[in-house]
């Protein structure tokens, strides 16, 4: 069984015996325990289990104790460390020297002992040695016997832990390409050096003929298939067939296509993570899967010109339920766009929620909307908006039919109610695919995302000579008047899933206007997650050494390693680029 990645907590202490160290032992170890309790009681792994922490076997005052802690962490699958102290300690003697995992240090803000002095000293050592570390220092002075963690410190500890766990969860997993490059899309030209050096992941690839091989040879669970057919007939609404009359398939042909796309889902899932049932059926090799944390399916055009498309498979892999019940989602990219797949993966690992994959299709200005519909935009839509619409697939969680406190949300699977599953199904239909584009047929996914959800749109791009860069746009989904929605939606493909999105504007740079957001977006796709998580993404990017070229996160929420400030404090974007370039990828 593969261990969860853990956070290692390192209580460091003044090494002077005969009174000084002894007086600090309890307070120092209690700081470590309080941080571990905070993380374990607040954060969860993608499977819903509480995040695990490992505390050093003793306080760390000298190098042998630092070495003992390091050995314990190596055996315990520790993916990041947090050093805590209320006092002065010996900086380079007590620091963790691991260069390939993130580090953070919390220096207690008190007057009796100089925790802040140690924090500054050890961060200077980290900078000198080229091992980045995040500095955490409470805004307000605390009493020496105060065991509470201040709110500002909690926020930084949790932001750091979420991002650090994401690095650990990615390491030693795989991106699985099902097929190759789709229609010349740059993101589906998979770059193995990026995955290996920045994420610690490997790349695997199967030809799309693996789907037909498994279908023809019965390499899937036949009992599950029969159960799935019953569930689909009961719960899935086939939508309006908008094809030309000569392209409309017969009822019998559509029945065969439903069988086909259900098998595609089962095979796609089994390729990613394996299925012990296959071993029972005599297919031991196929049963192990590819250990894929994220995958993509090429589809267009070689597959879709002949076979039913991947929309149903992609939709339900990215959704948190199927005929087997509620479960955690997979991360699965349309058109094998690996860079959007990674963008989805970042979002997923930070939130434990499913991801919307969408084309960043159209910028609608207030003037254009007025001309086409006669409607004057107002509220969050007043400056215009973006039409996010994928060519036929999207997680059903993207409907926004789940709720929290009466508001639409996308939530982790362990919070999802059966009634919310039913609401998602009732508000979605699956029209036959547009056969002018998808000659082999299939079934698209059609819904409208509910408005007023805080969301973050993300995209990772590769820039020759620089490497990966990340862009982030926080904003809100919109609910347009029904007639306005239909008028605009019908101008594209009304058989596809639509999300209306208004980014939050700042009045400067790429966020001067909604048009500027669209104009500066780096690719045709975006990954959309529930919540405003831009600050967490910036922290994660700094750990991986990926510069952020565009974001609308308030400056006070940006949390990067302390040595980033040594690259400059006025132009943070430039400092970020130079820090990432100098330090290089996390796993190189």
Curated annotation (Swiss-Prot):
Q: What is its EC number?
A: 5.3.1.25
Q: Please list the cofactors this protein needs.
A: Mn(2+)
- Listed binding positions for Mn(2+) are 335, 359, 525
Q: Tell me where on the tree of life, at the top rank, the source sits.
A: Bacteria
Recorded GO cellular component terms are: cytoplasm
Enzyme class at the top of the EC tree: isomerase
Instruction: Give one GO molecular function term.
Output: arabinose isomerase activity
Question: Pfam families from the xrefs?
Answer: Fucose_iso_C (PF02952), Fucose_iso_N1 (PF07881), Fucose_iso_N2 (PF07882)
Q: Name one GO biological process term.
A: L-fucose catabolic process
User: Record's CDD domains?
Assistant: L-fucose_isomerase (cd03556)
Where are the catalytic residues? 335, 359
Q: Which reaction does it catalyse?
A: L-fucose = L-fuculose
Identify the InterPro entries for this entry: Fuc/Ara_isomerase_C (IPR004216), Fuc_iso_dom3_sf (IPR038393), Fuc_isomerase_C (IPR015888), Fucose_iso_dom1_sf (IPR038391), Fucose_iso_N1 (IPR012888), Fucose_isomerase (IPR005763), Fucose_isomerase_dom2_sf (IPR038392), Fucose_isomerase_N/cen_sf (IPR009015)
Arranged from A to Z, the UniProt key words for this protein are: Carbohydrate metabolism, Cytoplasm, Fucose metabolism, Isomerase, Manganese, Metal-binding
Which locations, inside or outside the cell, does it occupy?
Answer: Cytoplasm
SUPFAM superfamilies per record: FucI/AraA C-terminal domain-like, FucI/AraA N-terminal and middle domains
Q: Please give the Gene3D superfamilies that the UniProt record associates with this protein.
A: 3.40.50.1070, L-fucose Isomerase, Chain A, domain 2, L-fucose/L-arabinose isomerase, C-terminal
Q: Pathway, per Swiss-Prot/TrEMBL?
A: Carbohydrate degradation; L-fucose degradation; L-lactaldehyde and glycerone phosphate from L-fucose: step 1/3
Q: What does this protein do?
A: Converts the aldose L-fucose into the corresponding ketose L-fuculose.
Family named by the database record: Belongs to the L-fucose isomerase family.
The family database entries (PANTHER family) matched by this protein are listed as:
L-FUCOSE ISOMERASE
Output this protein's name: L-fucose isomerase
Q: Name the source organism.
A: Streptococcus pneumoniae (strain 70585)
Taxonomy, top ranks, is:
Bacteria, Bacillati, Bacillota, Bacilli, Lactobacillales
